[in-house]
Amino acid sequence: MSRQSFYADPSSAGRQMKYRKDLFPLLDTREITACLLECEFNVTQELIVKPTADFVTNLFEQFLDTFMGIPLGTIRKKARKMSRINPLESDQANGKPQQSPEEDFNDNQENDKTKDTFSALQLLILHRYLAIFFSTCGINDFVLTDIARPDGYRIRRILSAVINFIRFREDQSPKFDHLANECEATADKVSEVQAENSATMQKINAIKEKLEMDSENDESNRKNLQYINSYNRKLETKLRELKVMQERLTKEHDDYKQEKALLAKKLYDINFLYNETQEQVANLTKYAETDLSILVKITEDLSNDLSSMQTNYKNLEKSYQNMGITIDSIQVNEINLKDLLKLAEDITRNVEKRQIEGKILKDNQDNLDELTRKQMELEGQILIVQNQLNKSNKKYQDLIVQADKKESAVKLKLEETKQEFNDILSEKEKHNEEHKRIMDQIVKIQQETTAIQDAFVKESKEVELKLINLMSIIKRYMSDLRNNI
């Protein structure tokens, strides 16, 4: 599951369309300013729209101080140490002996190179820390130009990711308060052990100095010195044990931090998958409500049309029977009667065809009911998947509560949860394929129904034309009959 976004040219007019969709919302400058001011960061809307390198550097250093525990000035100290710049060099410049102009020129060039190296190192170190922090926030395309030549849109996107991270941390922080308290207590214990170590070392040094002074003045203190040396060895042994304990506590604290980050990331992924499943359930419900009602209405309309056609056919058949009695007694109009019989046979075939089409419509309705039943079963399976996701969330909460237990038990529980999650994903893919197949069948039935409707309308018009011709023939025949009578 990738969360990367592609970096676009800041000067391009269509740079916003070159980013792939991020998992966090893009906020406007007003909301960004309000949120950062609420978090006690010194920002303005003008600086966010048109950021400067100094503003971005200071703001990002405050982010590192607040969220990663890197104090302000640490990056400058590391850059100064790496470039071997003496921070007091400018203050001591007046105390140097006077040099020749050529030596002064060479020194100035060397100082300029050193300062350039210091600026570049400071920028690289800041970028390294920020890349780690922004990757956690969902920004994986952070580059050096975002610090040296910041762009308004990219800074707005980065600040939106940071605010989304702050909101997520505020929502999830109550769940980890007890773990944070335990970490603070462990850190306090480590500090106490370190203070005890320092005090013990000071005592040892003081005793050594005192013993050295006493040994110079009086040789009778040798026995005491031996005793103190043995005591010192015991203290050194205890000091080594305390150092081992300190290293172990530090390692446990680092392991806890890594475990905490993994658990938080897994919780974010599960919430994201849960939201996607909710959207798919809503779409399935919408399809079920809309398509079924339309097909039922179409079927009812076709049934009503079929009933009206059958009624017309019965009336025509009755009229034909009444006219047949008169036609049998009249030999003169035999040819016209044959034409009428042929036309009546055509009408009968058309009516039988309508009945067949009605049967087909009924079969389609049965298929539609079957598809509806399968769709309802699929919705029930989706609800089961949703319940399984809820159970997974509950298990995940239990894992967070038991995070301070043995590492082996935590890993075993995480593997079980991961297996269940993979099963749910595979089951979800199967359900998606089944849903796609059902939707294809529904579309096919709709197309067949539309074709039948069109054919029915066309044949109805043809029958109406034939009925009109039949009525004209009957009227002409009746008028001829009256004239003959």
UniProtKB/Swiss-Prot annotation:
Keywords from the UniProt entry: Cell cycle, Cell division, Centromere, Chromosome, Coiled coil, Kinetochore, Mitosis, Nucleus
GO BP terms, alphabetized: attachment of mitotic spindle microtubules to kinetochore; cell division; kinetochore organization; meiotic chromosome segregation; mitotic spindle organization; vesicle-mediated transport
Quaternary assembly: Component of the NDC80 complex, which consists of NDC80, NUF2, SPC24 and SPC25.
Coiled coil: 177-449
N-terminal signal peptide: none
Keyword Cell cycle found: yes
Residue segments, region Disordered: 87-112
InterPro entries, alphabetized: Kinetochore_Nuf2_N (IPR005549), Nuf2_DHR10-like (IPR041112), Nuf2_N_sf (IPR038275), SNARE (IPR010989)
GO MF: microtubule binding; protein-containing complex binding
Protein name in UniProt: Probable kinetochore protein NUF2
Localization per record: Nucleus; Chromosome, Centromere, Kinetochore
Keyword Coiled coil: yes
